[in-house]
Regions:
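Long, repeat-rich segments with strong aromatic
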Residues: 200, 207, 224-227, 265-268
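Active-site acid/base region of carbohydrate-active enzymes
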Residues: 3-28, 67, 80, 85-89, ...
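Amphipathic, soluble alpha/beta structural segments
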Residues: 107, 227-228
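Long, K/E/R/D-enriched contiguous segments that form extended
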Residues: 231, 236, 246-249, 260, ...
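Internal glycine-rich alpha/beta core junctions
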Residues: 154, 263-265, 275
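Substrate-binding groove/exosite segments of carbohydrate-active enzymes
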Residues: 2-134, 140, 199, 249-262, ...
Length: 275
């Protein structure tokens, strides 16, 4: 407790107990890499099944970064980077022995692409330019893999229940698996995330003076923003939705629509309606 941030919040004893309990859980889940795993750093385990998860780790580190003086939690992501394939693919779930849980072309094999966000949040707090230089090519290669392997012919993105981390949401058409199938849909949250991440990687590139390496990301971000604005917004209900293969929109409102808050795809009137 002498090293970790100690909030001052008079009259909120229960909340403070929860805060310190969260740190106890975190510290209790620090793991050393198994011999031969290919992992390069001790890491913060997801505390689920012994595997590390791309989605979970990115969110956990948003909290754990405040404990950097105690332990280099951010290096948890280095184990994903170390397991990147030559074509840029990174599996979303990796076993403690370093084995991917899914084959790359499985619809549930990867995503959501949130690691660049986690890295930029860390950079904005600590200014670690050396780390930014190291992770930039890894993150750009992964983005390019998604663009090559997770898009329809019009450039929009697809995913799956496990690929989005929201497998309990009723969004795919009847007959498709809500967990394993892409449903021949344009997946709203995945497209918003890729738009958000493209701009973050461009920002990262400007800091590193390497933006020329990915300047095509700017064109993709504009394309995604226009498509989402023109095709995934429903004026009647004032909300954003997934799109089916026949061009109609899903009727299920999902929290994934609020990734739009990290983008500029909606105007003020639309945002006010959706919120």
């Amino acid at each position: 407790r002498q090293i970790l941030p100690s909030p001052i919040w008079d009259g909120h004893g229960k909340e403070m107990e929860m805060y310190w309990r969260a740190w106890e859980i975190a510290v209790g889940n620090i793991r050393k890499p198994q011999s031969g795993s290919g992992f390069v750093s001790s890491y913060l385990d997801t505390a689920y099944n012994g595997n590390i998860f791309m989605w979970d780790s990115s969110f956990i580190l948003m909290f754990a970064r405040y404990g950097t003086r105690f332990f280099p939690f951010q290096r948890t992501l280095d184990n994903f980077y170390a397991k990147q394939h030559p074509d840029g693919f990174i599996c979303r779930e990796i076993k403690a022995d370093g084995a991917d849980c899914f084959e790359r072309y499985d619809p549930v094999s990867t995503g959501p692409n949130l690691m660049p966000w986690c890295e930029m949040v860390y950079y904005h707090q600590f200014g670690d330019m050396e780390r930014l230089h190291k992770v930039f090519p890894v993150l750009c290669s992964y983005y390019k893999w998604l663009r090559l392997n997770r898009t329809w012919r019009n450039g929009t993105y697809w995913s799956s229940g496990w690929g989005t981390g929201m497998d309990n949401m009723p969004r795919v058409p009847n007959g498709y698996s809500p967990i394993y199938s892409h449903g021949h849909m344009v997946w709203l949250d995945t497209n918003l995330q890729q738009l958000f991440i493209a701009n973050l990687l461009l920002e990262m590139g400007f800091y590193l003076e390497r933006w020329q390496e990915i300047e095509e990301f700017e064109d993709e971000a504009k394309m995604l923003g226009k498509y989402i604005h023109d095709n995934l917004w429903d004026e009647k209900t004032g909300f954003l939705y997934d799109q089916y293969a026949d061009g109609t929109l899903c009727k299920t409102k999902g929290i994934g629509a609020y990734w739009a808050l990290f983008t500029n795809v909606l105007d003020t009137i639309q945002l006010n309606r959706m919120i």
